[in-house]
Amino acid sequence: MGPEALSSLLLLLLVASGDADMKGHFDPAKCRYALGMQDRTIPDSDISASSSWSDSTAARHSSDGDGAWCPAGSVFPKEEEYLQVDLQRLHLVALVGTQGRHAGGLGKEFSRSYRLRYSRDGRRWMGWKDRWGQEVISGNEDPEGVVLKDLGPPMVARLVRFYPRADRVMSVCLRVELYGCLWRDGLLSYTAPVGQTMYLSEAVYLNDSTYDGHTVGGLQYGGLGQLADGVVGLDDFRKSQELRVWPGYDYVGWSNHSFSSGYVEMEFEFDRLRAFQAMQVHCNNMHTLGARLPGGVECRFRRGPAMAWEGEPMRHNLGGNLGDPRARAVSVPLGGRVARFLQCRFLFAGPWLLFSEISFISDVVNNSSPALGGTFPPAPWWPPGPPPTNFSSLELEPRGQQPVAKAEGSPTAILIGCLVAIILLLLLIIALMLWRLHWRRLLSKAERRVLEEELTVHLSVPGDTILINNRPGPREPPPYQEPRPRGNPPHSAPCVPNGSALLLSNPAYRLLLATYARPPRGPGPPTPAWAKPTNTQAYSGDYMEPEKPGAPLLPPPPQNSVPHYAEADIVTLQGVTGGNTYAVPALPPGAVGDGPPRVDFPRSRLRFKEKLGEGQFGEVHLCEVDSPQDLVSLDFPLNVRKGHPLLVAVKILRPDATKNARNDFLKEVKIMSRLKDPNIIRLLGVCVQDDPLCMITDYMENGDLNQFLSAHQLEDKAAEGAPGDGQAAQGPTISYPMLLHVAAQIASGMRYLATLNFVHRDLATRNCLVGENFTIKIADFGMSRNLYAGDYYRVQGRAVLPIRWMAWECILMGKFTTASDVWAFGVTLWEVLMLCRAQPFGQLTDEQVIENAGEFFRDQGRQVYLSRPPACPQGLYELMLRCWSRESEQRPPFSQLHRFLAEDALNTV
């Protein structure tokens, strides 16, 4: 028997064994080994924090140093302080342990509750939630006790952050340990349709309730969930191995009636190139209720996100005893195909497909192997590990310890919970019936005094709540000892407090767009709702580095799963005075101010006319400057007629603005001082000697382009369906060549910004000003005006985004580049040719606009474009469509757009 025949026989045996059970699949109950915080397997360099009262890293590990990690700032009320652990590789974390500050038995700080956030790539952070949507985890009740908490569901993560909580200003300290094992499967995310609901005698919810990615337009992408949590469903899909969950919890299911194609398509992304031998899918076959095994599976492969699917797909028809109603694992041979991305289609053989787990048998492949025919996308930045030696998604690393036993969800636990609830109810009744003195007596009986002096804890010992005392302490409680101030050497004498609460300095102001608190959920599943793709990281400043060409640090996201808008990634476009701010390239310190020196403007020469808009920390005013020619020290334009005032826009920072807001305001001044172009508003001067800080820029006498064009009629009434209300022309008119001249000036100004690698991020007619002889200048304060509030989509009540002008990659990924400005220019050109009589995508709601961005990404021909304006020639409309190309590199540069509009547009038909 040859090697090829032997290999085929082994694979067939594997497939046959998989039909009965997923024997090689990992058991999450055994993945509970201490990962190394207490025994220092995790080095100091992998432990960091938002701030720390003491520089001692030993405190983060155990009872050394100050006895625990204590944040320098108060955790109340913002809850922004965190302790971060970098595991260097992906791990499945199933259990966490916490303890308060030790300090030789003198510490009294601990955290009563905390939250967890985790990341697989260091860019996108996700908040851990239990199966009912609760984020807050109960912590310690005293500084000595160790509290172990099972994470249900477990999380696949490389980086984990602990966020302690408090209900008032107080000192909080933590010692932590993580339990789990190495994630060997290499699966980073899967994309699948949203699970559906089966209606029997009761509703059976077959949604992926623990999925930690995003949901847009009925598609889940960018995360992991129940199909990769190690929990295999029961034969009766209405029952579950978990307690207090809804019917159907263990399975994700789809109805044949909802898929006209006859199959469910899923895509899987892995950490690096792998040679795939087989895929195991645990399916339900309770055919009496409509669940059937797949009729067949078809898989395609590719090695990179931007590459085409390679070769012929692997097809496998599933047979076997389909009449047996037991759930089972079916194995699909994959023939050793090499890929990072798999797209598999599961064919319906009955009314429903129900999956509880999907795993892969694969080996890591060297990227530079000659057998692969070239080089491919680099492996992720975490250290590579040896290939798996058996069919398991996890490698158990005992580190010389025993795994922590899992608390079984037995009837005894349920009975204890019921007894506790009854006791609490009785206590409440007694409290309502008895006097206050009796209530205090009951409370005093419940108080306990800690008599122990010193404690040594090993969090790897099994148990749920562990209290270990090494030796008896004194009868009187030890004196309180504060954590050492940073830089002070240790001392042995304890410090007795004066009885007042320790007020810690608040951290610097930072706007967070992620919302952590959610209302409690009942035993039912979450209500289906439109999930807006949001990038939930905000910055204290508003200047963002645009994308530059070159090799990325990490492989780009797969192109068949709608990308996330980076969680930890909402970019706020709004500056401190309400207008948008330019995204500027990364420059060395001080380079932003390399423009001409700013000119101090005499505040007394400004005469207020009206308020144009406002933001969180400032306002934009329209002012006049009388006799500007008298201000010889200022670089004013010379086209202001003598005796006429000069119109200027004045951005004013309120005196009560935060320090960060003041810094952002001064950054904006430096950036504006660099802009010198006839089609960009210029910085004329500043008032920064005293409050309020002001910057003075150009303003044009005809106002913004949107209001200007909407008051005009098109001269060429012969153009069929020209914008208008069908009545005789009233008011001023404008010609089609003049509209092209207006658009060419906008393209010229954007061409100048592109040469500086500046990104505008809010290009629209509302942000263009009109002067004499149809002179156009691009501005930046349209976002601050209440007049245009309907043009912006408000995210979580804070950030505003002009989604109707934004490219799809801006909406889904927060990626702003010069190419995304080209997209916005195409929409602006559409506005100009419509004479600003209609809002882009006016027939769509904001949610439908976001869904349309997802259609652009999926590129399946269902995306919607703006229609051709009646007065727009076909050749010019084709130029607009090029601006809205899916691939950013296919969009024309601004130099080409300006040349076409200035020279060739009149010749188009």
From Swiss-Prot:
Residues 21-413 are extracellular. Pfam families: DDR1-2_DS-like, F5_F8_type_C, PK_Tyr_Ser-Thr. Residues 188-363 are annotated as: DS-like domain. Disulfide bonds join 31-181, 70-173, 299-344. The keyword Cytoplasm does not apply. The chain crosses the membrane at residues 414-434. Residues 31-181 form the F5/8 type C domain. Ca(2+) 1 binds at residues 207, 226, 249, 251. Residues 606-901 form the Protein kinase domain. Keywords: ATP-binding, Calcium, Cell membrane, Disulfide bond, Glycoprotein, Kinase, Lactation, Membrane, Metal-binding, Nucleotide-binding, Phosphoprotein, Pregnancy, Receptor, Signal, Transferase, Transmembrane, Transmembrane helix, Tyrosine-protein kinase. Residues 1-18 form the signal peptide. One of its GO terms (molecular function) is collagen binding. A motif (PPxY motif) lies at residues 477-480. Residues 45-65, 466-495 are annotated as: Disordered. Residues 435-909 are cytoplasmic. The active site is at 762 (proton acceptor). Ca(2+) 2 binds at residues 226, 229, 231, 356-357. The keyword Cytoplasm does not apply. Its EC number is 2.7.10.1. ATP binds at residues 612-620, 651. The Gly/Pro-rich domains may be required for an unusual geometry of interaction with ligand or substrates. This is Epithelial discoidin domain-containing receptor 1. It comes from Pan troglodytes. The lineage of its organism: Eukaryota, Metazoa, Chordata, Craniata, Vertebrata. The gene is DDR1.
